[in-house]
């Protein structure tokens, strides 16, 4: 209406004169809107009244509360909050400090699943706890609960005859709703139909759920809600819990594997004066006491190599890295990596270690070397990824020449402007996008992504990168212009990067200076010159090989997840208020189109 009125305002600001028919039409429309609002308000008040009555009436369906769950979620929250407040007024504590648990739900099921239908072990009393996911009444004296926790379900069969009095039975069970966390004291048993249950004589409310819990039958499928309210996702979706158990197993396996090889786990700073160790755009923060900007680490590499200089020959770190770059299905601004550095080794040694670690991890976690993966989601095409060693190995430049069907300049000429122009022309001819700055390194990276990475379904080592793409890697001992580096790709995605480390301080400083020129030319991802690191190299870094793995992507493959948010407990999300502001702006823009004079 406001947009219509705005459109009808005259240039001189005076109100337009409406015809009788138009005035009548508008009054009729306004009356209709008012009647609709009044009717909705009356309906809401009626629902609220019914639900409140159900919440306080102890004779209604033993408090299962279908009337409550038919109301608006906001009204449900109000009703539930009032009920919990009333418990406090009556001297009851809905949030007790402690409840002793004798046995987990998992152990209970394992220990008593052998019982026969109709068994009731009255001589065994146990305490268990969990969250109510369903509540069903069978008459006035028998109530069943589905108690969930630890990824399993146990039935609670509450019978009034097992309580001190029927009044006590009614009182406690009327307090409980779906979503509440309860403690149950009772006996193991099985129903006549063979359902393993705990048969209580006492139930304690440990923490009420004030919000209406979605029904398990419908589940929680909205991804936006799942990622923003991960706790709710975990409550309702058992498969989510399993994904994070697998993620934890991946980290545990890697840590154990490296420990057995004699590596020392270390911790290095997450805030750095100079961001180094990778080609990436950093986050910037500010230190009040030092009165200076600091950079969140993009990689821990340089610190690790300093420790190898100091005589710790085998080091590793599992931790968070931060890169101020895009968010998509495989990238998150903060992510988890494992990096290790091994003195007296080269990239050939690390390829063997990688094969053993990755294939062993897949076999340990899944029971097989083969994993089924759906890159486009559950409804898309399935791929069988075979992690059986040895993995395929290809030379980057040679394979790129085969894929392009043409010979590239000699690798010792890759740093020339002529080579850059040739690669630029190839990208244009092949319709390969490369945002500026169109440096040789970036052009090569885009071509490799377009023609080589897409062929890597099973684990594949892409080896011997050009020096211009690898400022921290050591030059190839037999191929000028290349480095002793490899990347491991699975399902077209990189999961590992490793190389024989550059330990010549003069050469390292020269490469840093070339990176500085690239940064000056507009490449935000180019490296800074790190003088402290160069000084450390001057004390002598032994022949060393370094390795890094993206834990999140490995977790994606082993949990069959095509979105990195599925394997991050709390992924980066745009704030909801910001989203609302954007939506409001869009709405305002759409309603004011054509209204300008």
UniProtKB/Swiss-Prot annotation:
Region named Disordered: 1-71
Residues modified to N6-acetyllysine: 88, 141
Molecular function per GO: amino acid binding; ATP binding; ATP:ADP adenylyltransferase activity; identical protein binding; lysine-tRNA ligase activity; protein homodimerization activity; tRNA binding
Effect of residue 80 to H: In DEAPLE; uncertain significance
Annotated positions of the Phosphothreonine modification: 591
Coiled coil segments of this chain: none
Sites bearing Phosphoserine, chain numbering: 207, 590, 596
The enzyme's E.C. designation: 2.7.7.-, 6.1.1.6
Regulation: Up-regulated by DARS and EEF1A1, but not by AIMP2.
Reported impact of residue 200 to L: In DEAPLE and LEPID; reduces interaction with AIMP2. Reduces tRNA-lysine aminoacylation
InterPro entries linked: Aa-tRNA-synt_II, aa-tRNA-synth_II, aa-tRNA-synth_II/BPL/LPL, Lys-tRNA-ligase_II, Lys-tRNA-ligase_II_bac/euk, Lys-tRNA-ligase_II_N, Lys-tRNA-synth_II_C, NA-bd_OB-fold
Processing and modification events after translation: Phosphorylated on a serine residue after mast cell stimulation with immunoglobulin E (IgE).
GO CC annotation terms, alphabetical: aminoacyl-tRNA synthetase multienzyme complex; cytoplasm; cytosol; extracellular space; mitochondrial matrix; mitochondrion; nucleoplasm; nucleus
Result after altering residue 207 to R: Strongly decreased tRNA ligase activity
SUPFAM superfamilies: Class II aaRS and biotin synthetases, Nucleic acid-binding proteins
Keyword Coiled coil: no
Keywords of this entry: Acetylation, Aminoacyl-tRNA synthetase, ATP-binding, Cell membrane, Charcot-Marie-Tooth disease, Cytoplasm, Deafness, Disease variant, Host-virus interaction, Intellectual disability, Ligase, Membrane, Mitochondrion, Neurodegeneration, Neuropathy, Non-syndromic deafness, Nucleotide-binding, Nucleus, Phosphoprotein, Protein biosynthesis, Secreted, Transferase
Protein family per UniProt: Belongs to the class-II aminoacyl-tRNA synthetase family.
Function: Catalyzes the specific attachment of an amino acid to its cognate tRNA in a 2 step reaction: the amino acid (AA) is first activated by ATP to form AA-AMP and then transferred to the acceptor end of the tRNA. When secreted, acts as a signaling molecule that induces immune response through the activation of monocyte/macrophages. Catalyzes the synthesis of the signaling molecule diadenosine tetraphosphate (Ap4A), and thereby mediates disruption of the complex between HINT1 and MITF and the concomitant activation of MITF transcriptional activity.
Name listed for the protein in its UniProt record: Lysine--tRNA ligase
UniProt organism field: Homo sapiens (Human)
